[in-house]
Amino acid sequence: MEISQFNPAQIDEVARMAASVWGKEQGAHGAEVARVFCGHLSRYSLYSSELALQAVDEDGLQTITFAWMPGDTNDADVWVRNQFTTLSEEERNTLLTNENYLKRIDAEILAKMVPNSAKLSFFISRKKGYGTPVLNALIERLRSRGVEWLYLWTDCTCNWQYYVNHGYEKIGEGVAPEFSTDKEDYTYYMFWKRIL
């Protein structure tokens, strides 16, 4: 396994990785919605290639982790709206609901962030044992910038227990009514960890 800085030209491959996890849910809305959702999620999470790392081995790209600092921006909103031309109104509304969810929870965690902090915005790994070394390398990069706290949010579609098991403290949780059903709440969780 080789850990290196992520090349933004590979963002479509990251979207395909995301589709293997989150695309299944979106697939209920159609293959094109799943493709656009995962493409948007990947682009929405990438702010700075300097705070984006990857693990590659003989089988290709295996792990990705992105972070952002308060004030960072990207053009994910423009990208997703450029995809709307081929979608129905219902499909566009599905994607806008997802975008609003991402922005709402990001705003919620941003309100909790203290000075000298960053947010882990994306973390996915295909191979067991690859994720933690890549995340640790990103944390080292953040430490070199003087970042003291790492924040993140995740939800019930992810392995949120990973963070509990790796020393992150839960600082909040909530229910997303737009994705909840009568039988099950769609829960999201917020964590932080002192890294410096």
Regions found by a protein language model. Name each.
Residues 1-16, 27:
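A short beta-loop-alpha structural element at the N-terminal edge
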Residues 29-58, 62, 66:
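Active-site rim helix/loop that mediates acceptor-substrate recognition in acyltransferases
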Residues 71-122, 126, 179-183:
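Conserved acyl-donor/pantetheine-binding loop and adjacent beta-alpha core of acyl/acetyltransferases
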Residues 117-118, 142-155:
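Conserved GNAT acetyl-CoA-binding A-motif
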Residues 121-127, 151-161, 178:
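Conserved beta-strand-loop-alpha-helix junction that forms the acyl-donor binding cleft
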Residues 127-141:
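Conserved acetyl-CoA-binding loop-helix of GNAT-fold acetyltransferases
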Residues 132, 144, 156-174:
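Conserved active-site alpha-helix within GNAT-family acetyltransferase domains
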Residues 151-153, 169-187:
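Conserved catalytic-core motifs of GNAT/GCN5-like acyltransferases
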